[in-house]
Design a protein with these regions (language model features):
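Charge-dense, helix-prone N-terminal extensions
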Residues: 1-174
Length: 174
């Protein structure tokens, strides 16, 4: 059984934060990272918001890392993408990506469901990866093949789903 933190319990039993409050919380989560990782993550988040218009953004500030999921609904199981941020890294996960055609071999991973592309790793950002035609094609194919399609004309919504009371440091040690 998963232990519920006081923040999770409060989130389930009270009024959810406004969009402005959720944005402030997300900003504080990102600020825990090294400045260059934070800046890269903010730029990546901005690009993803343009590529996945109208997504429900579900934020999990977990023990190990920060995760921002992009979904057509508020159901985590229907999310299509996520940005995952362990210390010193930013990774784009294709949450329904195992069957995506990838002739350029950009996707990493061998699991039955998820594939990923590392965007930032230990001080080596790839700021142009989300502009790469092969990666844009993968994103478009993932959107078109999603179990639940993104609703046309939907407005973006930011939801803080989980905040772990105990967390590992967000800055790389060393």
């Amino acid at each position: 059984m998963r232990k519920t933190t006081s923040a999770n319990h409060a989130a389930k039993n009270s009024t959810p934060p406004s969009q402005a409050e959720a944005k402030t919380q997300l900003d504080s989560f990102l600020a825990k990272y090294e400045p260059q990782v934070e800046a890269f993550a903010r730029g990546t988040l901005s690009k993803m918001r343009k590529l996945v218009k109208g997504a429900i953004e579900m934020v999990y500030d977990n023990y190990n890392w920060l995760v921002i999921g992009f979904s057509p609904t508020e159901r985590p199981s229907e999310a299509i993408f996520s940005l995952v941020m362990p210390p010193g890294r930013v990774t784009l996960c294709f949450l329904q990506g195992a069957g995506l055609p990838d002739p350029a071999k950009r996707l990493q991973g061998t699991g039955h469901v998820v594939r990923n592309i590392r965007l930032y790793d230990a001080g080596h950002p790839d700021a142009k990866v989300l502009d790469d035609p092969e990666v844009l094609s993968l994103i478009n194919v993932a959107l078109n093949r999603a179990k639940v399609p993104m609703p046309a004309g939907a407005r973006r919504k930011l939801i803080i789903r989980s905040i772990s009371a105990k967390q590992r440091p967000r800055r790389a040690s060393g």
